[in-house]
Amino acid sequence: MSLMKVSLLLGMASIGLTIAVVFLCYSLYTYTCETNDASSYNKTTSSTTFSPLMSSTLPASEAPWEKDFRLSPDIIPKLYEVKLHPDLITGLFTCEEKISVRVLSRVNYIYLHIDRLNVTKSVVTQNGVNIPVKSAFSYPKNQYWVITLEKSLEVGECTLEFLADGNLRKQDIVGFYESRYKAANNETRLIATSKFEPTYARQAFPCFDEPSMKAKFLVKLVKPKDKYIALSNMNVKNSIEDSPGPNQTTVEFEVSVPMSTYLVCFIVCDFNALPSVKSTQGFPVNVYAREGQLENMKYAQDIAVKSINFYVEYFGINYPLPKLDLIAIPDFVSGAMEHWGLVTFREASVLYKKGSSSVVNMKRVAMTTSHELAHMWFGDLVTMGWWNDLWLNEGFASYMQYKSLAKVEPSWEVDTMFLTDMLHSTLQLDQTLSSHPIVQTVSNPDQITEIFDVISYQKGSSVIRMLENMMGADNFSKGVNSYLQEFQFKNAETNHLWAHLQRFAGNMSVTQVMDTYTRQMGFPLITVKKNGDQITFTQQRYLANSKANYDPNDSPFKYTWHVYITMTTSDAPNQTLSTWLYRNASEASISVPAKTTWVKVNRHQVGYFRVNYEPDMWKALIDQLITDHTVLDPRDRSNLLDDAFNLAESEHIGYNTTFSLMKYLSKEDHFVPWTDVYNKLARLEDKLYGTDGHANFQKYVRSLLRDKITTDTWVVENKDFLEVNVKIVLNDLGCNFGVKTCLSKAEELLRKWFKTGEKPDADLRGVVYRYGMENVGKEEWDQMWTKFKEEANPQEQLKMLGGLGSVKDIEQLEKFLEMAKDEKNIRSQDYFTVIIIVANNPIGLPVAWKYLQNNWDNLVKRFGLNHRVFGRIIPSVCSKFKTEDKLKEVEDFFAKHPNAGAGAAGRKQALETIQNNIKWVNKHAKPLAEWLEQNVSEEDV
């Protein structure tokens, strides 16, 4: 599944508030789930008479379904035969199901998963004989359907049959749910679709809903006879018209390969498809979308074909299904989902129209598509055995999307983008005490939902990138191929991957090295010193708060790491020197020529660590950048900026070093270093906002841009990907920090659109809407709202939301949040985007916080505490607080609402961030204000 960062907040997960906020949905949008109300789901009947609340023959204290969240290993599913009939008029669905299972030991009970289903029939058959059911009932605490039997099952084959019904979900858009859209004639059209990862298949049909319980699926879907189609993971086998009734058609699909329940997909819709395109392997790649959007699927189809061809060649294993479908869903809780053979997307993640979509949108479509197709192997073909190894799915897919696009879109320099897309944001989280290891124990749905986060996706991909660099690309590829070959159609654990990579890793112990990065949180700070011809390296744990207390014994490795150190030097800037700093060693060293003037450690930032240098070594690097920055690769320039800002924040170096480093930026033309600078300057401004140094800080940033922003910056007719991206970043940065020519241009283009209907260039719209709307009145706000309601392009709508939430009118922002409650105004999938947009507006931050406090109970009722984005809304809103009063408010709020659900980790992160902000303001705000007063020129831009 594509998390595309809640840094991911945005498709351009990196570029400031404007572009960043617009794509919030790309990150950490996922699913919603609420715990069952037992009273609602105990209405059951069976072919055998029993009391629905009858207890098991076992004492309650010994009942396995009561004491264990995990399923029993005694019953293994082999084949599901599932027939679902969604009624798009009533919003209900029925389920007829038969499960063939293997019984591995004699038991007189069976339990499997259900949630929000009403089971009306439970039949157990073995060797052609019905086994009398003693009782059948729901156990909501663990989301089980329990069947106790009059006699024990024998070892061997067994069949379970169920009838059930449920509601097509409308608000949480997980499980089997209803999605709506407006047709060209303004008619509301309905479709039924599904999203089962991680624990929502049980909301559609009784099942053994754990990833290790792989089985084959024979799916039948009932659809309206005319106009509608039915889609599932496999291709259609046959269709029976007027079945089960008039004007209905039952569509039967071929039996699937073995797969986990969360990968199954059911869709009944009235969409159309573009002509199929064949892969080099020969299977068709199809794309589907609603009326008016189908042509905008062409780019995704093209990327899909090229990506799938790359993966077949790279992995050395053919795609195992007879077809591959991609479909754009109007209401979708995450960026996309890798259902095997039927990949579902949020529309904003997959639609691209040349000439009216931006390069940011294009990148998002390409990244999301490549990510999901990597899952066809990592996740679908080979699946983690349990959710504690989720990173095997998501970390690998997140890295492979970059390898694929390096081949598909070579001019994009995707490995350079990896730094600001993935690496820097995960370092930001992982340098806190509230982080967690990549591999961690999870047991219940809230914990499972919670680990679909930056650590699983972005840290996972970052350490894989590091490991490939350690091993070499060819050896890494061979190890991956070996792993996939052995575990295809099976489940695997982290140690299995290490074992296969070890075969091609030479003398390096993959397990010993990588366990220090996957089984403990955090990362090292490498301190570099020069003594004659020796460059020495030492390590310590890096924390954003360098004075924080922690117990090294909390980690099995005592927060030390095996570090593969690479570096380049002034004498040979295109060559790489390397050594190992082992976790129990006091130091390591590399010899260099005595004439060496500078060294840059962690070449291309492939290592997962930060680097600090002695003052003279920092000065030598800064001098080189000012003299000729191109001697260092853009990845190294971005790395230096990222480390320098963070090291100053954690008090390892002074801000004078960081500000000196930025002097070279007048010569910088690559968008990745500028993207990193924007992110860091915006974070620094958040801390300075409301302090004496804020105005001078804005003036300082404007001085950095004096030679960078010209009239040409607003001309994006040349669609060179890298050039357009740097213009987007510079325009956004200039507007954000008050460059007058930027703000006036944004307002000019906005008013021109309002007056003449001529839209700004697609690549400028995010900036124009965001900053052009800052100072408008109610009339212009209403005008933008009308345009938002009339707009059919979901990507364009997201940009408009960014403008609607940017006004400096508190009353209007309050009204906006109230309007967003109504799903007729804002789709449920975009609701939290609106809140975060308002919170990212300095005027709107207290408005959004007050809104959350006043509406919390209603939000819990609407979304449930298992909703991942809801779980992260608190740190998203509160991360800019920096006073003791606000800290107390947040603590009191948590005390008033102690049940965090999937937001428990987010709450810890919020508190730690606020505490660190308070510490920073107390330590740095005054001296930084004094430095700015002395060093900022009177001349302004």
Feature roles, as predicted:
Residues 2-94, 128, 183-191, 209-211, ...:
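N-terminal, polar/Ser/Thr-rich
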Residues 68-72, 154, 163-218, 269-277, ...:
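Glycine/proline-rich low-complexity spacer/linker segments in large multi-domain proteins
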Residues 94-115:
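Ligand-binding face of N-terminal immunoglobulin V-set domains in extracellular IgSF glycoproteins
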Residues 95, 194-199, 206-370, 399, ...:
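Hydrophobic helix-coil surface modules that form long, contiguous segments used
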Residues 117-182, 245, 587-593:
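A surface-exposed beta-strand-loop module
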Residues 118-125, 507-511, 516, 523-602:
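Beta-strand-rich binding/interaction modules
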Residues 253, 284-548, 683, 690-710, ...:
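Hydrophobic alpha-helical and helix-loop surface patches within well-folded domains
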